[in-house]
């Protein structure tokens, strides 16, 4: 992992396939006059960030030894210490820019989606499942869109008319009640709508058809995934990623890219407009359903999101508070996407240990448990990673030490399991 204070912007215009996902190949101009932080001047967000030499960074960011296995960290690339060892304070302007595209043709997916078929699950069932996993079982239309894009790859490439079907089901008042709320208390004119399932205990009987259940049984993620979804144990995807990137460029939706976005934010890296080198298309198969459940309030994207420090609470959470800005190398980006289940296991372990920043594990832990050589490489590993696979085989490393054991099912879910059996 390298320390990097430069901002490079990649207008995506070419894509190639590799392995289980499609890396986004970019061409860019090194003479670009666009500057990320200058672009955020309209938000007026300034923060005093102490920066210091971090020769002891790997030790200070390690998780407590009782939480994760004791494994030696590899050497991290960093800037050489300067002559002045005293921490200096500089004012740095940071913020988040929404990816607003004038046309979807600006960024095109590389996937050959001719073999993708719409999941035979009704829109009313999709809306009900999204609502079931929302805090207080209340959800906005945008929350339903994000939930669908997050979990079913077909909709990332489909014509967006499906969103009209979602809105129609929510507003039909046959199965959902409507509430209004003010996302900004200071602005009385702006109001949003929440939708609530009528008779939430009757979702199975009223809203899920036999065809829906047949699809659940055949899904590659297994019946347990939908069992958790029925029980509300999946949760909603984190909203800020979808309001900035996922809804605007749907084929970049999904748990893998969402995790990358928040981990970068935790490292002090704000992803710039169309800076797509960090993201991948995961269209060959559905995600592995290893993501932990996040619980956060709905955040409506306004200028106050990046201008209020409280709304950027993940910023720098993966580093010491007096951090330098770290970045992923291209090789580490590949590893992050390939080993996403290991990353989610680290999050879950941090959560079990009651660590405050469990959503964004420390840089040291990501390097050790996600980029480390103790995790197995999947089939069709790109050439750039074959050296890691070879070393792992020579060392006799086969199993992921963070792989979760299957646990006994919650008795409260037995009825759901029986319904899905």
From Swiss-Prot:
Entry-linked CDD domains: FH_FOX
Keywords per UniProt: DNA-binding, Nucleus, Transcription
PROSITE patterns: FORK_HEAD_2, FORK_HEAD_3
DNA-binding region as annotated in the record: 118-218
Protein name: Forkhead box protein fkh-3
Intracellular or extracellular location(s): Nucleus
Major localization listed first in the record, in broad terms: nucleus
Any GO CC annotation of this UniProt entry: nucleus
Classification lineage: Eukaryota, Metazoa, Ecdysozoa, Nematoda, Chromadorea
Entry superkingdom: Eukaryota
Entry's Gene Ontology molecular function annotations: DNA-binding transcription factor activity, RNA polymerase II-specific; RNA polymerase II cis-regulatory region sequence-specific DNA binding; RNA polymerase II transcription regulatory region sequence-specific DNA binding
Recorded phenotype for the gene knockout or disruption: RNAi-mediated knockdown causes significant reduction in the expression of 21U-RNAs, upon simultaneous knockdown of fkh-4 and fkh-5.
Function: Transcription factor. Binds to DNA sequence motif 5'-CTGTTTCA-3'. Regulates expression of a class of small RNAs, known as 21U-RNAs, perhaps acting redundantly with fkh-4 and fkh-5.
GO biological process assignments: anatomical structure morphogenesis; cell differentiation; regulation of transcription by RNA polymerase II
């Amino acid at each position: 992992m390298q320390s990097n204070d430069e901002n490079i912007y990649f207008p995506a215009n070419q894509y190639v396939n590799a392995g289980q996902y499609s890396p986004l190949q970019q061409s860019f101009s090194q003479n670009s006059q666009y500057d990320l932080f200058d672009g955020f001047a309209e938000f007026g967000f300034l923060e005093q960030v102490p920066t210091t030499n971090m020769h002891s960074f790997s030790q200070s960011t390690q998780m407590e030894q009782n939480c994760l296995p004791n494994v030696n960290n590899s050497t991290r690339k960093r800037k050489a210490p300067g002559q002045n060892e005293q921490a200096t304070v500089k004012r740095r302007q940071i913020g988040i820019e929404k990816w607003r595209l004038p046309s979807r043709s600006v960024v095109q997916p590389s996937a050959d989606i001719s073999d993708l078929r719409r999941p035979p699950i009704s829109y009313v069932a999709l809306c009900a499942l999204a609502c079931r996993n929302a805090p207080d079982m209340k959800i906005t239309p945008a929350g339903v869109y994000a939930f669908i894009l997050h979990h079913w790859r077909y909709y990332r490439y489909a014509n967006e008319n499906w969103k009209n079907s979602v809105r129609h089901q929510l507003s039909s008042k046959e199965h959902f009640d409507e509430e209004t709320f003010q996302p900004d208390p200071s602005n009385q004119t702006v109001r949003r709508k929440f939708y609530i399932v009528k008779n939430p205990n009757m979702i199975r009987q009223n809203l899920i058809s036999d065809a829906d259940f047949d699809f659940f049984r055949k899904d590659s993620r297994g019946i347990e995934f939908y069992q958790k979804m029925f029980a509300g144990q999946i949760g909603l995807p984190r909203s800020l990623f979808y309001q900035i990137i996922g809804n605007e460029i749907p084929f970049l939706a999904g748990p893998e890219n969402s995790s990358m976005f928040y981990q970068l934010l935790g490292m002090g890296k704000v992803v710039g407009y169309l800076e797509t080198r960090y993201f991948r298309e995961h269209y060959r198969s559905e995600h592995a359903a290893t993501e932990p459940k996040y619980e956060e309030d709905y955040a409506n994207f306004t200028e106050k999101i990046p201008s209020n420090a409280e709304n950027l609470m993940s910023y720098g959470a993966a580093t010491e508070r007096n951090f330098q800005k770290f970045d992923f190398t291209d090789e580490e980006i590949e590893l992050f996407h390939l080993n996403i289940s290991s990353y989610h296991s680290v999050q879950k372990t941090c959560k079990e240990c009651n660590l405050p920043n469990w959503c964004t594990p420390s840089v040291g832990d990501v390097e050790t448990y996600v980029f480390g050589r103790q995790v197995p490489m999947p089939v069709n590993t790109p050439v750039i990673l074959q050296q890691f696979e070879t070393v792992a085989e020579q060392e006799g490393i086969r199993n992921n030490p963070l792989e979760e054991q299957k646990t006994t099912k919650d008795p409260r879910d037995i009825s759901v399991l029986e319904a899905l059996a």
